[in-house]
Amino acid sequence: LSQTVFSGVATHHGRNQQYLKADLDSGAWPQTQRNNAIDIIRKSMALHINGDQHLTTLSQYGVDKQRDSNWSFCTPAIAAGYPRSWLPDKVGMPHRNRPNHNQDNTGEYLDGCGNKVYVYAVGNPETCVDKNRYTKAHQKASGFGLVTIDIEAKTYKLDCFKFAIDATLPNPDNQFPGWPVVIHQSENRGENRLS
């Protein structure tokens, strides 16, 4: 558990969604210290739960190679203020190995700081046009993250609900694209099953 994600998984910022090559408001830099921290937590096989980015992502860190380290669940903000988006496809960032769901802006990337990161899911905001504060919060990709740990199966079930929904209804559109997801503990040291 920490304040922020250890990768720069935001490419566009602010009300006008301007492109920013490297987001230094993350744990992506300095790279040597970032890699040292990940090397330490990899041994724990822990899911890295974090926030602070106003943008929900599910990603996996790479140090020596793509996907050799812990998964990161950057949960959505309950009331996203400063808008951020992860839109690498829009700016032509090279990628490889999209997940099986083949959603845009997912796959293996080098972030703006040169870190290896596999982005499995992202909850980008919509264009905010509504004056109602609850509708606006929904459009800005506010929401709720839920982690269910199964200690016998050694899995983490990750749910990522949008803001203005009823989570008790089994509607797949209640969650951001790419969720829910189940990750096995051993995947946090690069023994990957999810693709």
Residue ranges, per PLM feature:
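Long, structured stretches of catalytic cores involved in phosphate-ester chemistry, encompassing
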Residues: L1-S195
